């Protein structure tokens, strides 16, 4: 009998969102007439921008001709998309990032997991708590942790608690670590980082030869022009950071799949013998071996995000979801709940009322208001007593959900 990867057996009962799905399915089976409103998983609801749809239609038509047909594309992404990304997302903000350092992919979730392929198993890993579960689970799957304890924390990981007490800003670790996951704007708390806060992390990473894995999937939702959108706005970050970005939330590509990862040339790790090795070369080799590239049609759609029309439509989508977040903040605050986030991110982080635990509040909203959210404890032990609501839904559903919750 074939032997399985035993690391998967260390995983807790289920990934957070499938567990939510199981509970919702059971509720719906018992209550078939209930009109559920889902403010849990961060999936967008509004249509793709017209500029992107038009570009993809043109690409589809081109694929129907001998002259315009495209087969396998470059694993790293087409040059015209990489150039557009470098120009609009990085050079426009003063970041020294070239097109060659951008690798187009089918999702930042995939990349934040796959990046472990090029990093050694012995690295000491630090994550915030609460945290996007993929960072933890992918390290468990890769054999970088021990077993989970009673609170769900895995042996071998360094957990950096974030809460209202520290402004949802993790403290620099007291012990040296090699790999640091940072996400700003933060999922799940909605917190943001200033340039000064990111500089402290960059300084730590450079002083300790650590690598920062920076998830900027929600950077488009930042409203304050003084806040950084990229780790590469910080001097020295090229020497110690990799950044993940996505078209999923700003341009609605959750169903079409397009993202990118930035690996600066010259960024180095070390081999077992101590020799310095360029990470760009390793990631390029990894992608060339294990990835066939994103569809030509989808990449043309992503390129259109950077057109004048595309930029205007993306701005409109971001504004729509941020207004949803503002409604959630306002209405739940008026209902007496303590609210965080939702000002620079599409997530609102709620302190559960009356000492209720996270899953208890989940069941309460599901059963009494027919509203689905995400229990904070699913993001880590320090998320217990909190609850996340997503602003990704129609205005009518957000208004109705708030009315139901306020009526409880």
From Swiss-Prot:
Q: Of which family is this protein a member?
A: Belongs to the class-I pyridoxal-phosphate-dependent aminotransferase family. LL-diaminopimelate aminotransferase subfamily.
For this entry, list what GO says about its biological process: lysine biosynthetic process via diaminopimelate, diaminopimelate-aminotransferase pathway
Q: Which is one Pfam family of this protein? A: Aminotran_1_2
Top-level division of the source organism's lineage: Bacteria
Reactions catalysed, as given in the entry: (2S,6S)-2,6-diaminopimelate + 2-oxoglutarate = (S)-2,3,4,5-tetrahydrodipicolinate + L-glutamate + H2O + H(+)
Per UniProt, the enzyme's principal EC class comes to transferase
UniProt entry tagged with the keyword Membrane: no
Task: Report the source organism.
Answer: Synechococcus sp. (strain WH7803)
| Keyword line | Aminotransferase, Pyridoxal phosphate, Transferase
Q: How does it assemble?
A: Homodimer.
Q: Where does pyridoxal 5'-phosphate bind?
A: 72, 108-109, 132, 187, 218, 246-248, 257, 292
According to UniProt, the name of this protein is: LL-diaminopimelate aminotransferase
| Cofactor annotation | pyridoxal 5'-phosphate
């Amino acid at each position: 009998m074939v032997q399985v990867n035993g690391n998967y057996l260390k995983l807790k009962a289920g990934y957070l969102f499938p567990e939510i799905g199981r509970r919702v399915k059971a509720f719906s089976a018992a209550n078939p007439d209930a009109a559920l409103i889902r403010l849990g998983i961060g999936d967008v609801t509004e249509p793709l921008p017209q500029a992107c749809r038009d570009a993809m239609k043109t690409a589809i038509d081109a694929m129907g001709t001998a002259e315009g047909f495209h087969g396998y594309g470059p694993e790293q992404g087409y040059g015209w998309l990489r150039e557009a990304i470098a120009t609009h997302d990085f050079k426009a903000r003063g970041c020294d990032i070239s097109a060659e350092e951008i690798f187009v992919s089918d999702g930042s979730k995939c990349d934040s997991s796959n990046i472990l392929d090029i990093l050694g198993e012995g690295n000491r890993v630090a994550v915030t708590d609460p945290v996007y579960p993929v960072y933890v689970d992918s390290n468990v799957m890769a054999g970088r942790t021990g077993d989970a304890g009673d609170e769900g924390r895995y042996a071998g990981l360094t957990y950096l608690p974030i809460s209202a007490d520290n402004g949802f800003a993790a403290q620099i670790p007291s012990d040296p670590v090699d790999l640091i996951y940072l996400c700003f704007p933060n999922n799940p708390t909605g917190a943001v980082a200033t340039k000064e806060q990111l500089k402290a992390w960059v300084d730590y990473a450079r002083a300790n030869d650590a690598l920062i894995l920076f998830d900027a999937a929600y950077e488009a939702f930042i409203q304050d022009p003084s806040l950084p959108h990229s780790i590469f706005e910080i001097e020295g970050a090229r020497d110690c950071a990799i950044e993940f970005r996505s078209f999923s939330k700003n341009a609605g590509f959750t169903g079409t799949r397009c993202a990118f990862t930035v690996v600066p040339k010259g960024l180095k790790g070390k081999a077992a013998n101590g020799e310095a090795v360029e990470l760009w070369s390793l990631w390029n080799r990894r992608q060339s071996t294990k990835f066939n590239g994103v569809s030509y049609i989808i990449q043309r759609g992503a390129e259109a995000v950077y057109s004048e029309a595309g930029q205007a439509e993306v701005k409109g989508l971001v504004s729509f979801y941020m207004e949803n977040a503002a409604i959630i903040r306002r209405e739940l605050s008026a209902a007496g709940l303590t609210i965080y986030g939702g000002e620079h991110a599409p997530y609102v982080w709620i302190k559960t009322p009356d000492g209720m635990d996270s899953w208890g509040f989940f069941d309460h909203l599901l059963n009494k208001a027919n509203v689905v959210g995400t229990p904070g404890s699913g993001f880590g032990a320090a998320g217990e007593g909190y609850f996340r609501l997503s602003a990704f839904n129609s205005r009518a559903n957000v208004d109705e959900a708030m009315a139901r919750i306020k009526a409880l």
